[in-house]
Every structure is written in structure tokens, then in C-alpha cells.
């Protein structure tokens, strides 16, 4: 059986007995007060807070297997992290040599209890350490059990206080892992400390466990509020989605809007001008036309629909009475009313056109007075008639006024021949056409 004298770290560490942190299988209990727990160091090291302990599940399992489930004294290796601890190395060596022959001594360095009081967990029970409850309470328990390393001035059998009853220790077992302060070969980083901050303040593991749960209880309302906020955002998004019209709604509204606009007697330009004057959004006639033809983008259609709907409601509610919409529409109507000419008046104009396609201003005035028409109406009619003649005459076929005159079937025999001005005008138009074709 290996003894404490064979410890390779004997020169800079003290010897700990085979007592180890033992899990109790009894229901509702934590660490048993009577069982072997972390023991204090011998004389020279008692009360020295610089000594730190390295625990290894692998070493515990190996030593337990080789000694029938009991741990030897060098299962725990004590490493000093400050240089002044090496001053008591001689005293530690002497104490270790004195106890080399009795590994189960009852001295302060030896076992705190009999080996029968220690229970070592089997490998099957260790698998239970990975359950959900153990993982949830891992940081608090780990910190609580590691904090007992600061109790250097205690008695020979310092034990871990039990946590509140009602929680099964089989599922909330201790989970030992390598802290962040470890380096190669289990040596400790001097700046790091494994002492729990709660015990440094004089608090107990129970208080730390309660504080851990209180911290979680404080975090849960925050998460609940966070979920409520997301729920509110989702409800707002769904509400905005309901307000957004679909393509079918836009198509149906555009069709109804066009029918109502025509029935009310407003042009597309009137609607665009009314929107700009009433609501501050100026739209052209082309935009209104493209809306009715569903040629705008979906985004622009959605923006324009509420304005047109508002205008349509106001126009429907004020039908039959002079409103601001009618006044605005009247201002927007820059085109004059279409003039309809009777058949008899149109024949007189046609006969005069055959004699002179481009009459002078005096001839237009005289003709307007005879036919009881406005001067502007007569002038526009002659302009339109000349454009029609150009479309009807095939290119490359020169015609004289006499040819036009003879081909006119509705011209009477007493119609005077065209004047020289008309002939000169007609010849000039033919010359221009010939030059253009060349």
C-alpha cells in the first residue's frame, strides 16, 4: 500500500489523508457529517489560506478501485501557490514520515471516520449527474463545495453543510470539473482562487444557494416580459398584415373607382388635381390612369388606394350640390367642350375647302359669320381637314386643284373655280412634299 511519503509534491505541499468528498446515498441528505470530508492540514499549514486543493475524479476512482473502495492519503494533492508556504516543508515532511506506517491513523491528518462510513459512488450513479436538475444547479453546488477549501482553521473532520431538505441528492449530486485556474499537471495558477466569494464574505452555502435561486427568480420576470414584448410585436405585425390590401382587393377597388368616377363626371386629370389640392399629394392624369389599369407597383397601389377612397367617399356624399371638388375639377378642365357640327354646315365647309384648302383670316371670319360659327371653330376645322387630306393622298401622286375639283362628286356646276391664291398654296404644298420625299 502506497503511503503519504511517496507523494511527489512532498517538498512543497502537505499531506491529506484518504478522506475525500463523498456523496451520500441516503435520501434527503447531502454530505454526511460523520463521513470523511475535506480535512484540515497539519500544524504548520493550519490556517494558511494560500494552500489550494486539486481534486480529480480519475484519481479518486483509481485509488478506490485498488483499495477496496477506500481512498489513500495521496488521493488529494496539496499545492502551494505562494513562496512563503515552502518554509514549513520540513515540518510537513516530519509529520508525513511519522504517519507513514499508519495510513488509517486517527491523528488530525488521518481519517476523520472509519472507512465503513464512506460511500463511493459507482459508475452507474455517476451517469445520473448529467440529469437536467444537476446541470441546472451545477454552478451553485460546485461553487458551494469548492468553497470549503477556505475552511483551513477548522477541526479534523470539516464537513459540508447540508442544503435544504426535500431535494434528492441523487439527482443534485456534486459535479467536479477542472476550474479555469488549472494549468498543466494539475498545478494551480497563482492569481486564480478556488475559494468561493460567499465564504470569503462570511456567508454559508445555504445562503449562496438561496441567492442563486433568488437570482433566477429575478431573471424569470425579465424573460417573461421579453416574451410579452415579442407577443406584442407579433400581434402588431398581424394587425398591419390585415390592413394591407391584397391584389384582388386592389383590382376590385380600381374597377369600382373607375366606374364611379365616370358616373360622377370627373376625368382622371380632375381626380389628380383634386388630390393635390385637398390632401397635398399631387398626382398626374397618367398616375390615375395607371392606377385604374393596374399598371403601378403593388407598393404604390397600396399608397394611392386610401387617398382615392377618401376622395370617392367625399364625391359620393356631395353629389348634386356644388362642392369644392366640383370647383377644383372645373379649374382643372382646360380643354374646351367638344363641338359638334351639323351635316349641312359640314357640307358648306367641305365645298369651301375644295376651292381653298387654306383660307385667309378674312375668309375664315366671313365664313364663320355666314355659318353662324365661332371663328376659332372654323379655323380648327380647316386645320383638321388639311391633316386628313395628307393622310388620304398617297405619296408620289401629285394632284392639281382641278383634279381635286373634278373628283369631288358633291360639287355643283355653278361652283366657281379655285382662286389663284388657292392654286399657289396648293402648288407650294406639292413642292414641299416632293422635296421631303427626295
Swiss-Prot record:
Residues 242-316 form the POU-specific domain. Predominantly expressed in the embryonic and adult central nervous system. In adults, isoform 2 is expressed in the brain, ovary, basal cells of the skin and muscle satellite cells. Residues 103-123, 146-159 have a biased composition (Polar residues). SMART domains: HOX, POU. Residues 22-43, 102-172, 186-248 are annotated as: Disordered. It holds the Pfam family Homeodomain. It is found in: Nucleus. Keywords: Developmental protein, DNA-binding, Homeobox, Nucleus, Transcription, Transcription regulation. Residues 160-172 have a biased composition (Low complexity). GO terms for biological process: brain development; regulation of transcription by RNA polymerase II. Residues 210-230 have a biased composition (Basic residues). Its main location: nucleus. GO terms for molecular function: DNA-binding transcription factor activity, RNA polymerase II-specific; RNA polymerase II cis-regulatory region sequence-specific DNA binding. Transcription factor that may play important roles in patterning the embryonic brain. This is POU domain, class 3, transcription factor 3-A. It comes from Danio rerio.
Amino acid at each position: 500500500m502506497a503511503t503519504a511519503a511517496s507523494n511527489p509534491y512532498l517538498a512543497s505541499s502537505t499531506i491529506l489523508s484518504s478522506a475525500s468528498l463523498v456523496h451520500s446515498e441516503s435520501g434527503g441528505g447531502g454530505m454526511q457529517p460523520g463521513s470523511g470530508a475535506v480535512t484540515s492540514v497539519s500544524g504548520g499549514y493550519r490556517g494558511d489560506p494560500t494552500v489550494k486543493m486539486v481534486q480529480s475524479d480519475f484519481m479518486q476512482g483509481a485509488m478506490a478501485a485498488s483499495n477496496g473502495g477506500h481512498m489513500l492519503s495521496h488521493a488529494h494533492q496539496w499545492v502551494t501557490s505562494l513562496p512563503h508556504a515552502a518554509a514549513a516543508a520540513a515540518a510537513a515532511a516530519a509529520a508525513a514520515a511519522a504517519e507513514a506506517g499508519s495510513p488509517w491513523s486517527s491523528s488530525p491528518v488521518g481519517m476523520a471516520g472509519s472507512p465503513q462510513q464512506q460511500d463511493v459512488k459507482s459508475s452507474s450513479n455517476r451517469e445520473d449527474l448529467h440529469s437536467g436538475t444537476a446541470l441546472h444547479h451545477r454552478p451553485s453546488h460546485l461553487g458551494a463545495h469548492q468553497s470549503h477549501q477556505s475552511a483551513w482553521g477548522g477541526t479534523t473532520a470539516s464537513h459540508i453543510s447540508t442544503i435544504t431538505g426535500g431535494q434528492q441528492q441523487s439527482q443534485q449530486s456534486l459535479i467536479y470539473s477542472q476550474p479555469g485556474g488549472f494549468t498543466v499537471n494539475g498545478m494551480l495558477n497563482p492569481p486564480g482562487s478556488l475559494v468561493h466569494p460567499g465564504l470569503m464574505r462570511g456567508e454559508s452555502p445555504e445562503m449562496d444557494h438561496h441567492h442563486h435561486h433568488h437570482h433566477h427568480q429575478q431573471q424569470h420576470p425579465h424573460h417573461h416580459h421579453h416574451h410579452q414584448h415579442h407577443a406584442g410585436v407579433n400581434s402588431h405585425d398581424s394587425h398591419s398584415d390585415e390592413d394591407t390590401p391584397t391584389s384582388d382587393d386592389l383590382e376590385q377597388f380600381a374597377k369600382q373607382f373607375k366606374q364611379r368616377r365616370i358616373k360622377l363626371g370627373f376625368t382622371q386629370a380632375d381626380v389628380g388635381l383634386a388630390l393635390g389640392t385637398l390632401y397635398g399629394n399631387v398626382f398626374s392624369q397618367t398616375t390615375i390612369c395607371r392606377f385604374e389599369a393596374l399598371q403601378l407597383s403593388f407598393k404604390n397601389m397600396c399608397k394611392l388606394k386610401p387617398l382615392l377612397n377618401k376622395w370617392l367617399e367625399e364625391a359620393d356624399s356631395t353629389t348634386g350640390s356644388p362642392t369644392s371638388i366640383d370647383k377644383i375639377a372645373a379649374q382643372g378642365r382646360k380643354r374646351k367642350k367638344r363641338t359638334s357640327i351639323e351635316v349641312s354646315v359640314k357640307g358648306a365647309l367641305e365645298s369651301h375647302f375644295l376651292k381653298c384648302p387654306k383660307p385667309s383670316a378674312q375668309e375664315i371670319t366671313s365664313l364663320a359669320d355666314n355659318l353662324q360659327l365661332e371663328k376659332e371653330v372654323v379655323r380648327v376645322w380647316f386645320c383638321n381637314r388639311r391633316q386628313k387630306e395628307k393622310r388620304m393622298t398617297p405619296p408620289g401622286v401629285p394632284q392639281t386643284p382641278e383634279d381635286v375639283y373634278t373628283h369631288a362628286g358633291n360639287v355643283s356646276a355653278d361652283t366657281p373655280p379655285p382662286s389663284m391664291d388657292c392654286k399657289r398654296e396648293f402648288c407650294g404644298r406639292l413642292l414641299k412634299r416632293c422635296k421631303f420625299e427626295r
